[in-house]
């Protein structure tokens, strides 16, 4: 009932002020879909899972592992073309390109999703430039074009759109999303591609040069708000954290503590706030210390399980950011499925970078402020 009241109030505010809202649907993660089909173990072995590769590329060719979106679970609708063609996308603050499958992609991966047909759009213009996003075992190949992109009540008549003609592997066959809409800085975008939010800012289509994200714990009422901060989604005050590198939404974490003792990120570390990842990644050595402290044990998928009966006695994990504490309770950093509880912390052997995904964002309403290059955090309702 509370979610319904909040949603109705938000919609009323949107209509009154011209604020743009995109409802986010919480769906099944690709990890869970693969596990249900008995495909996860083989997939992880073949992909040589390294989430850090999502965060190590600049230049003309984007490079992202297929596993980047293995844990994405919040999706929204956009429309491309005239008349509009509908797509479900991950609104991803960890990348900058917009791409969807096209009718020229004939693989089962594409056939299982909505595919854009440029021939049916009177406003489509082929840019004549290739798009290549490299994954662990192949490439998403395609091309760039211009077309009208509609996001809620915002209509951008001249947005660059990537259209895939080839997608690697069968893994995306089971995803609930069609494509990706990146919300990171333009320095991460492929050559000739302009990020959607940058276009909106340049054309003054948003009231303010910022956007905010609320992720409901139960998946109902989750919202991406463009051009505004909505106090109805958080309690207390927003606290601001400066962006340290204008590529991702990257900032400094002072330390990670348990029971007042620093167990990870000792002396400070860099972290990224990423809506395209549901879990919380960190260097394997640091994450292992956290797993040991919370009593988690590794399973055959490389995940860490905890005893569901121990949640009440497990410790709170606290992130200190810009001098303030952001605690994560056991109920926040674990997920329960079919009687098993899994830790929301995962390690990466190839990076010192921390990635604060939905595990963190569900607890803290997040504002991404491009005008001032900062992130705002407040306790979510």
Swiss-Prot record:
SUPFAM superfamilies for this protein: Acid proteases
Propeptide residue span(s): 17-58
Biotechnology note: The extraordinary high clotting activity, combined with its very low non-specific activity may be useful in the production of cheese types, for which a bitter taste is unfavorable, for example Mascarpone type cheese. Large-scale expression of camel chymosin gene in P.pastoris could represent an excellent system for producing active chymosin for potential use in the commercial production of cheese.
Comment on activity versus temperature: Optimum temperature is between 45-55 degrees Celsius. 50% activity at 35 and 60 degrees Celsius. No activity below 20 or above 70 degrees Celsius.
EC number(s) on file: 3.4.23.4
GO biological process, one term: proteolysis involved in protein catabolic process
Signal sequence, renumbered to the chain: 1-16
Cysteine-cysteine disulfides: 105-110, 265-269, 308-341
PROSITE patterns, alphabetized: ASP_PROTEASE, PEPTIDASE_A1
Domain Peptidase A1: 74-378
Class of enzymatic activity (EC top level): hydrolase
GO molecular function: aspartic-type endopeptidase activity
Enzyme active site: 92, 274
Sugar-modified residues: 158, 349
pH dependence: Optimum pH is about 5.1. Activity decreases with increasing pH values.
Database matches in Pfam families: A1_Propeptide (PF07966), Asp (PF00026)
Residues spanning the membrane: none
Gene3D superfamilies (UniProt xref): 6.10.140.60, Acid Proteases
Keyword vocabulary terms for this entry: Aspartyl protease, Digestion, Disulfide bond, Glycoprotein, Hydrolase, Protease, Signal, Zymogen
Record field: catalytic activity: Broad specificity similar to that of pepsin A. Clots milk by cleavage of a single 104-Ser-Phe-|-Met-Ala-107 bond in kappa-chain of casein
Record's function text: Chymosin is synthesized in the mucosa of the abomasum (fourth stomach) of young (unweaned) ruminants. The enzyme hydrolyzes casein to paracasein.
Stated family: Belongs to the peptidase A1 family.
Stated name of the protein: Chymosin
Organism the protein comes from: Camelus dromedarius
Lineage: Eukaryota, Metazoa, Chordata, Craniata, Vertebrata
